[in-house]
Amino acid sequence: MPQTIVVKIGTSSLTDPKTGMLALATIGTLVETLTRLKQKGHRVILVSSGAVGVGCGVLKRSERPKKIAEKQAIAAVGQGRLIRLYDDLFTSLQQAIAQVLLTRRDLVDRTSYLTVQEALNAMLDLSVIPIVNENDTVAVDELKFGDNDTLSALVASLVNADWLVLLTDVDRLYSADPRQNPDARPIPLVSSSELFNLQVDAGSSGSQWGTGGMQTKLTAARIATSAGVRTVITQGKTPQNLLKIVAGEDIGTHFEAQPQADNARKRWIAYGLVPQGILTLDDGATQALLKNGRSLLAAGIVAVEGEFTINDPVELRTQTGQAIARGLVNYNHQDIEKIQGQHSTQIRQILGYGSADTVIHRDNLALLIAAEGI
């Protein structure tokens, strides 16, 4: 049965860890494997990191750039070299590809979010393999994905993928970093209920040339599985294992998809938007949201952070700082500060108007964790 498969390969798998030069054997095997998946009738998207790392190799830089403008320039050099290589290799196998460079801004606006979705699906319908990367040359810090793990999960959600496979520099998830802790235990399977409360010592920020790490992959798994996408973390140096994984073999760590995926609009609220502020909730409001699926009332808010206006996205947190949900507000930050802790019937009296009884209606609220996580 044809399936939609999103594959993300990280910089650590695409390049030599010492020199930053391209790992041509790995890339060649990846291209051949993705083409074979296409020949089997599957729809395939590749999310490829490596622009900055490859750019450093081209320019013979020994360290990743720290200045933003320099990084943007080097990314432009590397992206050109990387996509040329992909095009040459896929063309030799008579497989068409398309380059798709995205920024967070493309997903923040609902209209452009849907436009990206339609464009990706059109490419898949044309039997093209889209090759996606963040557009590092124009992305600004406040509107960056931060890493391609998050980007790949959002892409998988956009196209309602069956699989998201994260190719990385370890063969699976461990209870601790196996490169530093000899007692680290492999974790072959994580259920959807376990994932949101999973605590592992997952190391730090990834390779010298990349920005990802195991924590970002766990975040990606949470995003993808909430969209009904089965997610796998596995070794990037053996991309041929993709064929075995899709065929049902237990390779790497598998994260089970949620039995009931969140609807597309709530996924956009939860993960496509960038929160403009934070609302801290009391225990009663936290339980009402997580266990009863209620709207957020002013009475349950104990603190307001940030500056935002009506319909802006905000993050909802417990009093211990745990993020539990995101939503679109019915009032700006100044008005919420005035009505926090107050009964809904008092809103009109306090503000002089009352556009809504709720601060966030449940239709505009998306949970980030399961009720058992509190």
UniProtKB/Swiss-Prot annotation:
Disulfide bonds listed in the record: none
Annotated substrate binding sites: S49, D136, N148
E.C. numbers: 2.7.2.11
Pfam families: AA_kinase, PUA
Biological process annotations from GO: L-proline biosynthetic process
Span of domain PUA: 276-354
Pathway per the UniProt entry: Amino-acid biosynthesis; L-proline biosynthesis; L-glutamate 5-semialdehyde from L-glutamate: step 1/2
Entry annotated with the keyword Kinase: yes
Cellular localisation: Cytoplasm
SMART domains (alphabetical): PUA
Keyword terms of this UniProt record: Amino-acid biosynthesis, ATP-binding, Cytoplasm, Kinase, Nucleotide-binding, Proline biosynthesis, Transferase
InterPro entries for the chain: AceGlu_kinase-like_sf, Asp/Glu/Uridylate_kinase, G5K_ProB, Glu/AcGlu_kinase, Glu_5kinase, Glu_5kinase/COase_Synthase, Glutamate_5-kinase_CS, PUA
PROSITE patterns named among the record's database cross-references: GLUTAMATE_5_KINASE, PUA
Catalytic activity: L-glutamate + ATP = L-glutamyl 5-phosphate + ADP
GO-annotated cellular components: cytosol
Main EC class the enzyme belongs to: transferase
Gene Ontology molecular function: any one: glutamate 5-kinase activity
Binding residues annotated for ATP, in chain numbering: K8, T168, D169, T211, G212, G213, M214, Q215, T216, K217
Function as written in the Swiss-Prot or TrEMBL entry: Catalyzes the transfer of a phosphate group to glutamate to form L-glutamate 5-phosphate.
PANTHER family named in the record: GLUTAMATE 5-KINASE (PTHR43654:SF3)
Homology family: Belongs to the glutamate 5-kinase family.
Protein name per the record: Glutamate 5-kinase
Gene: proB
